[in-house]
Amino acid sequence: MKVCLVSPYDFVHPGGVAEHVRHLAEELRRRDHEVTILAPSSRVGDDHGIPGYVRIGRSVPVRGNGSVARIALSFHLVRRVRSLLDREAFDVVHYHEPLVPGVPITTLRLHRGANVGTFHAMARRNLGYYYGRPVLARYFHRLHGLICVSEPAREFISRYFPGDYRIVPNGIDTTRFRPDRPVVAELRSAGMATILFVGRMEQRKGLATLLDAYARLRRLRADVRLVVVGDGPMRWAYERRCEADGVPDVTFLGHVSGQVLPRIYASADIFCAPASGGESFGIVLLEAMASGVPVVASAIPGFSQVVASGSEGLLVPPRDPQAWARALDTLVADRAARRRMGEAGVRKAQGFDWRVVVDGILGVYAEARERAFAQLAGASG
């Protein structure tokens, strides 16, 4: 089967949708499907080391949902997309965030075959969907298969575009993230518990809450350290804040390679995801769980879909540094609980392995192809 995966977001900048598309493509190729990835990039001539990647347009930053998305907006998109579709004759085109302007909308308008859309996002509201509904509905109804990565994502998109959505979660490569990865020696110290954060340095990811909680925790005990992985517009401010407050044993690693990241997870004793909202799912939670690391995460809908409090970790109210400090203190003090939660996380992560997830996606592809064929037959008859 010839499949085209369409992403609206710049592949230079790491994010959940881009990672989802990369791993989906890998698993589809492993099953002998022919895969093309269509996405913008701010680097000309860079295939990002991905077979079948086609750069379509240069991205521009657009702010939304407490973050900055980089999407392609160009008058040349129509010509380039039409040429690709005519040349390749895909069996299925799979759009990730299909109603985002740029590459998805353009491709959806032009493709005459089976179209599948995955909706990843959730937020309190989306003014673009609200005011653009009369126009966007025309494109939405061109989709023959509808996927959401979680129940919160389904509830969010259904407010604007009701439909028969299938929930197929994000996946995890459990051969890549696993407890027996070699640790990074520099992140381990005898008698110290390593607390880990992985994410973009932006306000909604909640690192400020974690830094406050960690400062409180250090006043209670000296046997902890904090490791922060990721980059973004607020990194400098966070680093300066730690220096100014004199908070000890905080290490900012910045962006790390995909080869090193699994080893960093395996080096941690506790993983923290303090996001304040705007999360439909927690891919980083799965990465930590598959690595055998107990999770402390915000009690928000997207995260509670992944972690059961008391089983794979603890769920804590967002934006509450005192509650976070208490939760961290509890786990640091209880090595047996950490081990039990880590083992439970490994078991649960197996159900999110890409091999399982892609079975569900291929089922949607088959149904979408049947619907598209029936529509074409009805139109020609």
Name these PLM-found stretches.
Residues 294-297:
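Short hydrophobic beta-strand element within catalytic cores of glycosyltransferases
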Residues 127, 155, 172-187, 263:
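Acidic anion/phosphate-binding donor-loop and adjacent secondary structure
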Residues 4, 187-214, 227:
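Conserved donor-binding/catalytic core segment of Leloir-type glycosyltransferases
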Residues 7-14, 22, 26-75:
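N-terminal strand-loop element at the rim of the active site
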Residues 41, 152, 171:
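Carbohydrate-associated surface elements
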Residues 255-256, 263-268, 361:
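Short alpha-helical donor nucleotide-sugar binding micro-motif in glycosyltransferases
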Residues 239-256:
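Nucleotide-activated donor-binding/catalytic signature segment of Leloir-type glycosyltransferases, i.e.
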Residues 309-310, 314-321, 330-335:
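Conserved acidic donor-binding segment of nucleotide-sugar-dependent glycosyltransferases
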